[in-house]
Amino acid sequence: MVFYFQSILPYIPASLLTNKDSAMKHFLYSALAIFLLAGCSQKPQSDVDTPEYHFKAGMRAVESGEYNAALTSFQRSVDLDKKFAPGYCGLGLAHAHLGNVKEAKKNVDKGVSKGSKDPDVLALGARVWITLREHEKKWFKRASKLLDKALKRKENHEASLYYYGVAYLYNYDFDEAESYFRKVVGKKGTYAGKADAKWNLAQKIVRAMPGTPVGKKVALHEKITRADLAVLFAEELKISELFARMPQQNAGFQTPGQASAGGSAVNPVDSKGHWAETWINEMTKYSVLDVSPDRKFYPDEVISRAEYAMAVQRLLVVATKDPGLEIRYFGESPSRFSDVPSSHYAYNAMALCAERGIMHADMITGNFSPSGPVTGADALLIIRGIQSSLRMTF
């Protein structure tokens, strides 16, 4: 305290220091004391009121998606210790998830500056930049710089290897991501479980072979929307090219669900102005994806496995010119799925996809999970299954 007081003496006017007015002196010293105390760390109020404890609580909140609660915990950690580097990186991470880009960058820079020799802090800093990938063009460069530094501090540092894999995954270098996740799984440490899940995802995407930039982006989605599927069908399956190669349908051909292969000339009322408008209109034109009776497409709704199966069925019916495909499996006894009766509206589509190896039931339970979501990677694998079924190469 004395040191800090002495350090600011040169900036105090001499007239104030020599002032004989005791009231003025008292006011001056009181103000200085308050100022100095405000810059100091707060005192803990219990044995568990420590920076480390609050940091761990903050990280648990982050993993649970409770980012405002995380901010509170991380802030307390640095209030208790102004030099606590992990706390600042934690603040950066929570702000990044909340979209507070300026605060996220400020805190992560402060954290890695204070913890430049700690590989755990550097890895956490890299995680912040990965989270900011939608807001910062140089996110990969910044993240990899911190991870390289961490790995120099500690060779084969587990967290750094894991987040290098995550960085490559979101940079769409899936082969490189696989390599890092494989290393982490082999270490059988704290990150092994997470790495195994990401490794499986990377392997699945590699098998799906997304051939377009949009395919690579959607491949990472945990749930895809109807708009996402429209884009995938247009770009990865190349529906327009597929239909152009097909011979014209017979004049009287109709599927039970669609009037013709040409579909409706009227675009959905909710596609106009949507980011996927062009692709949505293309898919509804060919009746591959349906429009509801109120003429809406509902592009931002998450698509279910049953809905995806129905879309695949429509495509196969038109491609094969066999309307019987839409009713072939209805009423089967017993049902081939343990969770879906053969009277289900989408049962035929699900059975058709399973029969042709395009979509699969769970190998253990036999469940098809019709209301479950479709991941981006699974959506791409299904498209490859469609191509295989149609024996087409693009």
Explain the meaning of each model-derived region.
Residues F3-A23:
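Short, Lys/Arg-enriched N-terminal segments with co-localized hydrophobic residues
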